[in-house]
Every structure is written in C-alpha cells, then in structure tokens.
A protein has these predicted regions:
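An N-terminal hydrophobic leader/cap segment in hydrolases
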Residues: 4-5, 29-85
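Gly/Ala-rich beta-loop-alpha elbow adjacent to hydrolase catalytic centers
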Residues: 170-179
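Conserved alpha/beta-hydrolase fold motif
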Residues: 168-169, 193
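Active-site glycine-rich loops that stabilize anionic/oxyanionic intermediates
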Residues: 101, 109-112
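Conserved acidic catalytic loop of the alpha/beta-hydrolase fold
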Residues: 151-167
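Conserved alpha/beta-hydrolase
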Residues: 114, 121-143
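A short loop-to-beta-strand scaffold at the N-terminal edge of the catalytic core in hydrolase folds
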Residues: 83-98
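The alpha/beta-hydrolase serine catalytic core
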Residues: 44, 189-241
Length: 241
C-alpha cells in the first residue's frame, strides 16, 4: 500500500467530487537513520529470544509519534492564536483558533502538529473564516507521549463537538483516515471536506514500519493484534480500509 496521489473535495450532501491530482507524497519518516539501524538489530535479537517482547516493542513504536521540532513560523502562528486546553481522557488537547466566521477545522497527520497546515490560516481568515487547529494526543503541546488510533479519531470528534458546527474539514495524510473514522464511529459532521495525501489503507503504515525494521510477518501481526486488544474493541483493521 502507499499514500494516495490525489486530493478529494467532499460535500456530504452531494457525494464525492472528482479527485484533484497532485504530487505523490513521500514517506519521509520511513527512512534509514542510525536509530533505525539500532532498532533493527534490537528487533532481530528480541525475535530470536522473545517474539512476544519484539511484538510489544513494535506496538510501542507504532503508537508513539515522532517528535518533530516546531518551526519558527509555526511557533509564531501558534503564539498569535487564541489558545485553549480541552480535557480529553486523562489529559488535554491543545487547541488553537484564528479569526471569526464559519469554522474550518484543520486535522494534521501522524507526527505533525496543529500548525502543520498553518499556511492555510492567513488566507482563510482573510476570506472570513474562523480556523481551528489542534494537536492530536501525544503530539505537539497536547498531553501524552503516545496515541492509539481510536484516541486520534475520537479526539477529532471531541474538538468538533467543542468548537461547534464545522463548515469545512481539512485533513492531511494520516489525519484523513482518522477524520473519516471519526465520522463513522464518533459522530463527527462537516458540511464540506478537503482530504489530501491520504493513505489507501491504515495498514500501510504498519507495513512500511515492518519493511524498515525488517520484521517477520508474525511479529507485525502480533503488534497489530496488540493495537486491537488494547483499544478495548474500538479497533478493526478491516473497518479502517
């Protein structure tokens, strides 16, 4: 599986519009680094001595988003926002708002932050929209160091319920899958949607991780199963297709 190479503009009342082609995104986080080489060796040792421990490590890494440094322009945009902290689970979500008018909700991808789509904020505000962004669980300034898929999806719905009617939902990459799941299972509603650089299937992320770490299929399968078991029934890989 791979990321999609198109953008879909969606109006729930009118169905899907035609995909808008754009450059195919690169899986930039699935690259060779010294840390990756070390982890690959660790997985090899664990698989030989304790496959269960190898699967647990896979689960931990698959639910721990990478910490990407905040860029200066993102920090500046965040500092100019009306900021809020929304209670969520055992922690809180960091919320950011700019402007006034119909609400546009921005949903970032895995390992990003609320201001990742911040270049959209000034033109949207100038056009008379209120723009809301947030850091997903375990991302940016929100609580936690890890995030399960159900936490990510339900957080989108929680933010939407908090800020009120969503005129347009804009989601990127992994955030697209989570936003669609939030609509299926957590009651998220938006009049319009702009979804771009999505995944064909959420399993793609785990497949790329396994390829990078050279994981045996059994370890990957058990790691995925742990994600299901620890979601207390909220996870269903086929439903996320």
């Amino acid at each position: 599986m791979s990321p999609s190479d198109s953008c879909i503009v969606m109006n729930p009342s009118q169905g899907l519009a035609q995909p808008v082609p754009h450059a195919r995104p690169k899986a930039g986080r699935f690259v060779e680094t010294p840390t990756v080489k070390w982890l690959r060796q660790a997985f090899a040792v664990l698989h030989a001595t304790s496959p269960a421990a190898a699967a647990h490590l896979a689960y931990v890494l698959l639910t721990r988003p990478p910490r990407v440094p905040e860029r200066p322009w993102q920090a500046s945009l965040r500092e100019r926002a009306a900021q809020d902290a929304l209670p969520f689970g055992r922690g809180q979500l960091a919320l950011y708002g700019w402007g006034s008018g119909p609400t546009v909700l921005l949903v970032h991808g895995w390992g990003a932050r609320g201001t990742h789509l911040g270049k959209m904020v000034p033109p949207l505000v100038a056009a008379g929209y209120r723009v809301v962004a947030f850091d997903a669980p375990g991302h940016g300034h929100s609580s936690g160091r890890s995030a399960t898929l159900p936490q990510f999806a339900s957080a989108i719905a929680a933010v939407a319920a908090h800020v009120g009617e969503i005129h347009t939902l804009v989601a990127h990459s992994f955030g697209v899958a989570m936003a669609l799941w939030a609509q299926l299972d957590w009651g998220l509603r938006a009049r319009r949607q702009v979804l771009f650089s999505s995944l064909d299937h959420c399993k793609w992320v785990t497949e790329e991780f396994a390829r990078l770490m050279q994981l045996p299929e059994a370890v990957l399968a058990r790691g995925r199963q742990l994600m299901v078991e620890r979601s207390q029934g909220a996870m269903d890989w086929e439903r996320l297709a």
